[in-house]
Amino acid sequence: MNIYIKTMREDDDKEVVAQACTSLADIVRDCGFAIIEPYITRLADATLILLRQESCCQQVESDGEDDGDIDHDEVLMDAVSDLLPAFAKVMGSYFDPIFTKLFDSLMKFAKSPHPPQDKTMVVATLAEVAQGMGAPISAYVDKIMPLVLKELASSEATNRRNAAFCVGEMCKNGGAAALKYYGDILHGLHRLFADSEPDDAVRDNAAGAIARMIMVQPQSIPLNQVLPVFIKALPLKEDHEESMVVYSCVCNLLLSSHPQILPLVPDVINAFAQVVVSPNESDEVKTVVAKAVSHLISVYGQQMQPILSALPPAHANALASFANRR
C-alpha cells in the first residue's frame, strides 16, 4: 500500500500512476475497508493531490499538449476518479468526511474549459459515490443537481446515460433534499424516453432512474402520466445492470395491486415474457418477474388467460415454466 501511495504522489509517468490507481481501486473493492483503514488518510491525501493536478506526473513540463498528452490525462483522471466510488463502496456513510475534502476538486472537472468526457466522468463518479455512501449524499444534492440536470440534455449519449443513472441515485439516497428537483428531473428524463432518443442504454438508465424515484417517493410521482411511458420502454435493451431495480419496481406495484399499474398489465406481461426468454437476464431477475406473474394469476385468475394467450407460444411457455417454479 505504501508503494501505491508513493507512486501516486511521486512517479512522473501518468500511465504508471493511472495503473496504480486502477489496481488500488480493485484491491479496495475485492478486499474491503480493513485492508486500507490504516492508510486511508494518506490515500485520501494522494487522491486529492491528483484531483488538484498537483502530483509529480502532472507537473512534468512539455513543449505543449499533443493528442497523446490529452489521452494520457483522460486515462489518468478516469483512474483517479474511480477511487472515490471504490472507497464509498467499502466505507459507506463513513466516506462522507473524506468526500467532503475531495468534492470541490472533483467538481472543477465539470466546468469549462474541461471537455464533455470530463463532465461525464464527474457525473458517473458522483452517481457511484451516492450509491455507495447512501444518505450523506443529501448534503451535496443542491451542488450536484444543476450539473446533472444539464447533462440529461447533453449531445453525448454517454453523458445522458450517466446523468440518468446519477439522478436516480440522487433521488434514491438524497432524501428530502432531492424532492424539490423531481419536476425538473421528470421533465429531463421524459425526453430520454422519446423516439428521438437513439441510444438504448440511455433509455434503460432513464427507466432505472424512474424506478428508483417510484420506490422511494411514489407519492411524489404522477404515476398516471409516468407509468405508461415507463412501461412502454420495457423490456430493457442494453444496460441489464438496471434490470433488478426496474423490474422490482414494476413487481412491487403489481404485488400491491396499485390502481395505476393494473390497466397496464397486458403491456407488463408482454415485457415480462421477453425478460424470461432473454439470455441477457439473470435467473434472479426472471424469478422476481415470475413471482409477480404467479401473483396476478392467483388473484385475477380467468382475467389473465386472454393476456397470456395473446403471447407468442414460446414466450407463454417460458413464462409459465418460470411461474410454476414458485
Question: Language model features by range: what are they?
Answer:
Residues 1-326:
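Karyopherin-beta/Importin-beta family HEAT-repeat alpha-solenoid scaffold
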